[in-house]
Amino acid sequence: MAIVKCKPTSPGRRGVVKIVNSDLHKGKPFAGLLAKKSKTGGRNNTGRITTRHVGGGHKQHYRLIDFKRNKDGIPGKIERLEYDPNRTANIALVLYADGERRYILAAKGMQAGDKVVSGIDADIKVGNALPLRNIPVGSVVHAVEMKPGKGAQIARSAGAYVQVVARDGEYATLRLRSGEMRKVPVDCRATLGEVGNAEHMLRQLGKAGAKRWRGVRPTVRGVAMNPVDHPHGGGEGRTSGGRHPVTPWGVPTKGYKTRSNKRTDKYIVRRRTK
């Protein structure tokens, strides 16, 4: 994997920094694991905008990823690594001994030809998936379930990982990248190793159009709007907003805590540090 800084042949190329991975498959994805992905433009079924800054972008197929890793005891071979436009991580196409193919998240160091397996008897090796009760304390894992059998929810983006710091009874304690310490049932599965493509954070798109290719529309500042559109809007000339930062609906923002799910607070041993 290489980090390439483009030559400034035009203003739009001047700031571009690309991540080039020669190990990625250059052909089409495996057709049997693709699904239709329709554009919403950020609108719901009534036509109202429910998610701002969404619209346009290149047409994409969704890749069906195996987040459950429930094909126990059947060894699989990594056929190839692929780019996935739907996530920051790369994905790996696995061919299992029974002939089935599945996509999984590509772990750091994973290459074509590697063997992976899941289940309670799997070796402690990068890419293998096991229940947390069978993973040694101190191990680094990714793609962690929060409920047994539901599928991975924690640490799925590029470069992400969590560490198993303790195991007590029916719960394992995990340290997340944010600094949060969280309890998860020991029957939940996790995949050993870190998610690959950690260099993703170093890329620079270089121009606004590259964001538009990805389906991201511009973000307009509240102080640039009219009073009818935003609490910060209006005023003669340029103003600073005149109040603490709020969303277009008047809810405080920029650091204001909105978590109110007290039902699951008991699973958080220590809140995140930021």
Swiss-Prot record:
Region feature (Disordered): 223-274
NCBIfam families, per database record: rplB_bact
Entry's Gene Ontology BP terms: cytoplasmic translation
Keyword match Metal-binding: no
Quaternary structure note: Part of the 50S ribosomal subunit. Forms a bridge to the 30S subunit in the 70S ribosome.
MF GO annotations: rRNA binding; structural constituent of ribosome; transferase activity
Family classification: Belongs to the universal ribosomal protein uL2 family.
Residues forming coiled coils: none
PANTHER family per UniProt: LARGE RIBOSOMAL SUBUNIT PROTEIN UL2M, RIBOSOMAL PROTEIN L2
Cited SMART domains: Ribosomal_L2, Ribosomal_L2_C
Alphabetized UniProt keyword annotations: Ribonucleoprotein, Ribosomal protein, RNA-binding, rRNA-binding
InterPro entries: NA-bd_OB-fold (IPR012340), Rib_uL2_dom2 (IPR014722), Ribosomal_uL2 (IPR002171), Ribosomal_uL2_bac/org-type (IPR005880), Ribosomal_uL2_C (IPR022669), Ribosomal_uL2_CS (IPR022671), Ribosomal_uL2_dom3 (IPR014726), Ribosomal_uL2_RNA-bd_dom (IPR022666)
Protein name: Large ribosomal subunit protein uL2
Organism listed in the record: Shewanella amazonensis (strain ATCC BAA-1098 / SB2B)
Cystine connections: none
Function: One of the primary rRNA binding proteins. Required for association of the 30S and 50S subunits to form the 70S ribosome, for tRNA binding and peptide bond formation. It has been suggested to have peptidyltransferase activity; this is somewhat controversial. Makes several contacts with the 16S rRNA in the 70S ribosome.
Superkingdom as given in the UniProt entry: Bacteria
Presence of keyword Ligase: no
GO CC field: large ribosomal subunit
Short name of one Pfam family: Ribosomal_L2
